[in-house]
Amino acid sequence: MKLISSLDGSKTLNANNMETLIECQSEGDIKVPPLLTSCESEDSICQLTEIKKRKKVLSWPSLMRKLSPSSDFSGSLEPELKVSLFDQPLSIICGENDTLPRPIQDILTILCLKGPSTEGIFRKAASEKARKELKEGLNCGVSVNLKQLPVHLLAVVFKDFLRGIPLKLLSCDLFEDWMGALEKPTEEDRIEALKQVAGGLPRPNLLLLRHLLYVLHLISKNAEVNKMDSSNLAICIGPNMLTLKNDQSLSFQAQKDLNNKVKILVEFLIDNCFEIFGENIRTRSRITSDDSLEHTDSSDVSTLQNDSAYDSNDPDVEPTSGAASPNRQLEGPTPTMAGLDTRGQRDTCESSSESSVSMVVRLKSSIVQQDRRFSEPNMSPSRECLVGPTSKQKLARSEDSFTLSQDASCSEGDEAEDPFTEEVFPAVDSKPKRPVDLKIKNWTQGLASPQGHITKAFSRSSPGESLGSSPVPSPSCPKRNFFTRHQSFTTKTDKTKPQREIRKHSMSFSFASHKKVLPRTSSIGSEKSKDFSRDQLQKDLRKESQLSGRIVQENESEIQSQTSLGFSLSGTWALSVDNTFQLVDMRKPGSPPSYEEAIYYQTSGLTAYGGQTVGSMRSRMFKPSTAVPPVPSHHGGDLSEGTPGGHRLSSVTEHWTHSQTVHVSIETQGRSELHQLRTVSESMQKAKLDCLGPQHSHLVFEADQLCCARESYI
């Protein structure tokens, strides 16, 4: 019963409802009407109800057409009632007071401001998609921010507007009059004839023509920048201003001749716009600040906003005339290029065309020739610029800082304020800071720097402590890469204590020789073995840094054990001093080879021999508890010593002793303090030196000089 009551309560089917149903249904639903014939039966009541419900839903758009204009939906139909901007006569789109549409005024104002400084204006194409969207928006009356759009896009849209004017801007009916006026013999006659023809134009056409010719004249006067003189402008925009009514039926050659005539006419109008329309054309092309574009900025907004430095708020950069403030720029050009409204009072004061051209040139310089701070990044490699709170953006300031930083780095060797230059240590400066306990294998890369820097750095590192001349650095040897104990200078990168480090390491070069360097003898490095503890290694490094340049007797043991074993430094492993002695004792316990044999097997290029016997060395180094017996001094004869081996000192050995050219200057003061910091082997050497007589101390000193020579070479 409820179904039936709902059926009775609804509208009955009639002809109007059927027409609405058929119009709104799809093709598949057209076959439904056979069900309507059997609607009297009770079986089809449900189907009829569904059809009627569907009809109500589908007929909703038809109800929208019956709504009154005062309803809420009247706003959606409002754009359809507006007149489109394009393809309309100027008499329809212009106001009652002969005012141009607001979008056309805005476009002409922007072209007047930015056109003279834009290369290829009216010639370069724009995006087709953007052009269509802008035309649709202007046709529908949508508010568009034209200041943010590219100038070329506005020029293309304006040409479309001229092309869509019925009968064209110069009126096709006056085509013969324009051509006849142009054929006058003299220029004055042509100007007078063109004035008469222009007077026959409709009022809106004449108004737009004056504004357009003024803008084109300004652009042509700045052809050095925009590459568009009056001839080029006439070629690009002339066919949109004047054509024949039946130009579509003309042949190609006829159209070409027609376009050439129009081009000559438009070019003459551009060049003589002030003579034809009077000097007051500028006052007619004036808008107040309340009219178009709302205080139009003369700055190139699109260019500035796309620039990376547009939002720069650097306080110490003085603003220039071109980029200081857009509102300030408006004060100059606004009275001249103000825009396109004749409702205000006409100004009686007239100026020449040269003044307008100069105003455009100044406008162009303010827009285009901006300060270089807008396009160039800041270059401040100096440390002061990196640490300073504000980076200098002036080009001159950045150049000054860059030059000063370069000069400071170049003249750093000549200044005495910072004697610890980092340029001497390129390998260390390029790596991060390492802990002290790490073994740096590539410390010899620091010797690859120029000789002048190293010599300067170490000669002025400690003026009061320099005991000898600094040696010329020898080329880095690959066989001595693993030495880390006897370094000539430190590899620390800590800059907090530069003066202390200089005084430590400058002594290592004060004992070195610069006159003669003995041939290199390969030896096993004195690097600490890896099983040593970290504390022991740090202690040794600290002791050696304080005793840099002093003779460590372990080097002599290294030479002796190296020559006895005949090892080569082709491998990369190293032995400590104790391990070297143990290895020698294991092979030949208590019987090392003679001095001559060791020299013969290991260094065949050594022509001069040492100044002491193997027995004396063995007794001093391997027997610390027993005193070395005094060796009689024989000058010019053979020397012998009471050693277990009974070796004799040959004349070659005597010659090697006296031909040693290593010159060392040693401070004897403070020797007692240094004795306390020596290693075990140095303590043994001290006891042996005390046992020797004054006449035999010369031999030990010569052996010390040999170690100094090796230290200097490294």
UniProtKB/Swiss-Prot annotation:
Pfam families: RhoGAP. Residues 459-471 have a biased composition (Low complexity). The modification Phosphoserine is found at residue 398. InterPro entries: ARHGAP20-like_RhoGAP, Rho_GTPase_activation_prot, RhoGAP_dom. Highly expressed in testis. Keywords: GTPase activation, Guanine-nucleotide releasing factor, Phosphoprotein. GO terms for biological process: defense response to virus; regulation of Rho protein signal transduction; signal transduction. Residues 290-357, 370-419, 451-508, 520-563, 623-650 are annotated as: Disordered. Residues 299-311 have a biased composition (Polar residues). One of its GO terms (molecular function) is guanyl-nucleotide exchange factor activity. SUPFAM superfamilies: GTPase activation domain, GAP. Residues 492-501, 527-545 have a biased composition (Basic and acidic residues). Residues 88-277 form the Rho-GAP domain. PANTHER family: T-CELL ACTIVATION RHO GTPASE ACTIVATING PROTEIN-RELATED (PTHR23179), T-CELL ACTIVATION RHO GTPASE-ACTIVATING PROTEIN (PTHR23179:SF26). May function as a GTPase-activating protein. May play a role in transmission ratio distortion (TRD) in mouse, in which heterozygous males for t-locus transmit their t-carrying chromosome to 95% or more of their offspring. This is T-cell activation Rho GTPase-activating protein. It comes from Mus musculus.
